[in-house]
Structure formats: C-alpha cells, structure tokens
Amino acid sequence: MDSATTIKQPPPPEAVVIQMVMGAWVSKVISDVTRLNVPDVLKQHGSMSAAEMIARHGVEARPECLERALRACASLGIFTESATGEFGPTKLSDALTMDSPVSVKKLVESLAGSWWKVWTGLCDAIRTGEPQARNQLGMEWWDYLKANPKEMEDFGEAMKSNSLSSMKGVLEKCDFTNSKKVVDVGGGFGHLIIALLEKYSGLRGTVLDVPELIPIAKKNIQVNDPGISSRLEYIGGDMFKSVPPADVYVMKHIIHDWDDGRCIRLLRNCHQSMTGDGRVICVDAVLAPMGDTAGTPAKLLDCNMMVFISGKERTKVQWDELYQAAGFQIHTITSLRDNFGTSIIEGVKK
C-alpha cells in the first residue's frame, strides 16, 4: 500500500452519538424554513439569494439569518448553494412544496409547531407513563385540536401527506370488487374513500370522524362527480360508541392512537355492526419482535404515540391479541415496505 494513501477511519463513538442527537436541529431547521415558504418560492421562481427572497417574494426573515438557515439546509441536500450565495430547488425541496403530488409540507410544518412542544415532555412520559400533551399544551391532544380549528385543519392535511403511501397500498393490495359498503373509521377528509369509490363503481362509502372535523373535511374536499358524491357520506360521531353498518371497515393509522382497551372496544363495535362475511382492514406499523433492532422509524413513531396520547405501535403478536379479543382473526398481513414498517392487517370474523 502506498504510504501516502489515507485510510479513512470510522468516527469515534462520541461523534456518532452527537450526530444522532443533532437530528433535532436538522428537523427544526427544515421545518421552519418550510414554514417560511422557501421551497415554494424557489420552485416557482428559481434560484436566488436570501435577500431576493425577502425583498421580492415576501419571505419574512432577516437576510443574514435566512442565509445561515438555508446553508444548513443546503448541506443536507434540501437546496443547492452557489459560490455567489444563490440557493436553488432540488427533488428534496420539491417534496416540501404545496403542489407536489408527494407533498409532506403540512406534516413537516406540524412537526415544527405544537408537536415540537409536546416532544419536550418525552422524559416525563418515560418516567410517569403519562402522555404529555396536557402538560405542554394545557389540554389533551384531541381536545386541543377540537379547540383550535386551524390546527385541526393543518393536522388533517398533515395526515393526508403522511398516509399517501398507505392509501396507495390499500388501493393496490386490497380487493373491494365484491364489497357493498366500506366505512373509513377516523377517515379524516375522505381521500381514501373517494379513491375507492373512483375505482369501484358499485361501492358505497362513509367517512366517520369527530363532528368537529366534518365541516372542515367538506370544505377541503370538493367532489364534482355526481356518480361519486351520490355514493359518499360523511358522518360525525363517536367510534367508541358505535359505527355505521358496513361489510368492510378500514382504519388507517387509527389503532395506534389508542390503548388496548379502547382498541378492543372499537374493533368490537365493527364486529357488531358488520354485515355478512365482512372484513376489518387496519393500516399501521407492525413492530419487529424483541431482539430485532431493525425498523428505527417505527420505533420512534412508537415513542411519538407515547408522548402524545395513550397509543402505541404493536408487534404481530400484539395485533393478533387485539383481533382475537374483538372476535376477529388475522387473515393476512401485507407489508407496504415503507420507512415506518406500515402493513395492512386484514381480519375476518372468527
């Protein structure tokens, strides 16, 4: 070996740990630059300096401070950076724009707002076993959303962007050809139901969610095709009390929001209202079993459930226990192979 050859040594353990911990800084700088609308400005108008963004396109910031934040983002690959101080769009920044077909803008912006506040209580959640939304926001998370319509609307948009791959998975992996009616429990704005009604002309669909969300959903979703609108309904209600009759119930990122007792109650409601030889289809993470260290994002999502609400992500064994307790048995588990270990857990009556 040439004596001049440099052998790259792995970073020391403390450097690796510090890099991990700095992930909080990464999240915050990307989220806040997105809230300042920089990705949209660059997509629409092309490369420019921080000063130009402020002077010509209404970005509210101090030039030097914005430039420093943009340089940090450029080093992460979010933007390009020239020697003359101009920043440009990339494929990554496009995902942070409002009109991107894979937009995560609202989700990323939410992470910089109230979500960030609640996460400061993680240590207390670990110590006490209690969710920390009340301590950080003054009320429980779901009550906070009800009391803040704009936050609820943003949350709905965030969940839409967060569930695009899940929605695609349901459309591709689940067959509704012989189904008559599907209820999307906790269905938010109704994007999944509408997509199903577009694909299956003989299907009827219901979105069940909290009453406070229904007018927001109807405002945000305009269905101009009478062939679809005539088969679509929105119902405001309490899923823990009852669910509308149907032969298929879909719950996309719903079960992980709740403790085992409430999940079993919800699944039993579906069991009792289910018509014919129906199905329940849950879309959520399936955690790796103990001893398997794979699936970091899903395990971080599990911590997110812990600090916010009384929910959690579950292993295959835990999913089976929930279904069995509610009168179902797991028929299939189909992995969507995304970062969060999301799977479609389909159950039938025992």
For the regions a language model picked out, list residue spans one by one:
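Short conserved AdoMet
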Residues: K43, D175, Y200-S201, T275
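Core SAM-dependent methyltransferase catalytic element
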Residues: F328-K350
